[in-house]
């Protein structure tokens, strides 16, 4: 198994194996592994944003990536709430689990798709979704552009 496959499979799994793995590594290795993860997440984000733009081109607003969408966290009891927001350091003496089922298949497919995609032939700059309501500089630029539109008409 390739190291990136190993990392991504642990990262996408719904357990704390990824954190246990990182805790057992030295700082340089951990940062290198996190950089590998962010490169794949940037690729996924690029795909999502392009897909959202295609939907918006046909008039459908995809709320999950739209600026007006606000995500609510649903929990039924305080155990779920505690699990969601628990920031207790991870114990490193536990075993790391690796899901070799559908999640592993997804990771392999993601890696192959990234390698063979036309998007991968060009250098992918880190993609970040900017919400103008939370980014003051971008919001100010948009305000200037809007005010110039009004003044020019």
From Swiss-Prot:
Domain of life per record: Viruses
- Major location (coarse): virion
Q: What is a single Pfam family found in this protein's UniProt entry?
A: Pox_J1
Instruction: Give the family per the record.
Output: Belongs to the orthopoxvirus OPG100 family.
Describe what upregulates or represses it. Answer: Expressed in the late phase of the viral replicative cycle.
Keywords (alphabetical) are: Host cytoplasm, Late protein, Virion
Q: Which organism is it from?
A: Vaccinia virus (strain Western Reserve)
Query: What name does this protein carry?
Result: Virion assembly protein OPG100
The UniProt function text for this chain reads:
Late protein which is a part of a large complex required for early virion morphogenesis. This complex participates in the formation of virosomes and the incorporation of virosomal contents into nascent immature virions. Plays a role in DNA packaging during immature virions (IV) formation.
> What subcellular compartments does it reside in?
Virion; Host cytoplasm
DNA damage as a keyword of this entry, yes or no, is no
Q: Name one GO cellular component term.
A: virion component
């Amino acid at each position: 198994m390739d190291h990136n496959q190993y990392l991504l499979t642990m990262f996408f799994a719904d357990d704390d194996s990824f954190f246990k793995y990182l805790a057992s590594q030295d700082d340089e290795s951990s940062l290198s592994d996190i950089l590998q993860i962010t490169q794949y997440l940037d690729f996924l984000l690029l795909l999502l944003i392009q897909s959202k733009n295609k939907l918006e081109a046909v008039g459908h607003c995809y709320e999950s990536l739209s600026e007006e969408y606000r995500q609510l966290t649903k929990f039924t009891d305080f155990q779920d709430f505690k699990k969601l927001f628990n920031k207790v350091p991870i114990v490193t003496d536990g075993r790391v689990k690796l899901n070799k089922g559908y999640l592993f298949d997804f990771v392999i497919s993601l890696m192959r798709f990234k390698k063979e995609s036309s998007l991968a032939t060009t250098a992918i700059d880190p993609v970040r979704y900017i919400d103008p309501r939370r980014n003051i500089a971008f919001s100010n630029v948009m305000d200037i552009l809007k005010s110039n539109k009004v003044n020019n008409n």
